[in-house]
Amino acid sequence: FNLKPFSFKHTGIFPEQATNWDWFGHLISEKVKKNPDKPVKVLNLFAYTGGATLAAAAAGAHVTHVDASKGIVAWAKENATSSGLIDKPIRWIVDDCVKFVQREIRRGNHYDGIIMDPPSYGRGPKGEIWKIEESVYPLIQLCAQLLSDDPLFFLINSYTTGLQPAVLSYMLSTELKAFDGQVDSQEVGLPVSSNGLVLPCGASGRWS
């Protein structure tokens, strides 16, 4: 992975997400083992530098990687090359995530797994405004329409205090109730070696 420190304290990877990568990676690999002739299709929205994309691809999924920043998608491709995964079936898309999902619905496309890692605030390539408290629930509603008849998982991450684990669980439980499955949510964090505590780094809501 290619790391680059930024003034806003990002380095290009969120290591606390490793537990989620292991979680959906296991689901994907088990599905591939059971039915190797049927691709597991995963949609990664707000995909950033590709940590989740590469974890899904390494597990055997066909991944659609969507981010509004052309430079960030180029960085994700560099990471795929550095990780030896550039030849995996990954579609690299520079687009506004909401508009991409709307088009995918019209095209009739479906996915077995969906990953969402939305920012608290952002702008699309054409100036589209994203505010997580206002925008994330309608996007979950749209994404539910993209799930296949036998979906595998849905993951949403939050780095804002306005979307706590219980809120994520509520949204997923409400919108995915048509599918049999279980919802859980949790805080994610990084272990601190000096004191044995865990540094909170956000929250995740998961359906499978």
Locations of the language-model features?
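SAM-dependent Rossmann-like transferase core, predominantly class I methyltransferases
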Residues: 1-36
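Conserved SAM-binding loop of SAM-dependent methyltransferases across substrates and taxa
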Residues: 49-61
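Conserved class I S-adenosyl-L-methionine
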Residues: 37-48
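S-adenosyl-L-methionine
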Residues: 69-115
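Mobile active-site "lid"/loop adjacent to the S-adenosyl-L-methionine
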Residues: 70-72, 94, 98, 111-142
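Conserved SAM-binding motif I beta-strand of class I
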Residues: 62-67
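Short glycine-dipeptide loop
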Residues: 142, 147-153
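C-terminal catalytic and target-recognition region of SAM-dependent MTase-like enzymes
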Residues: 151-208
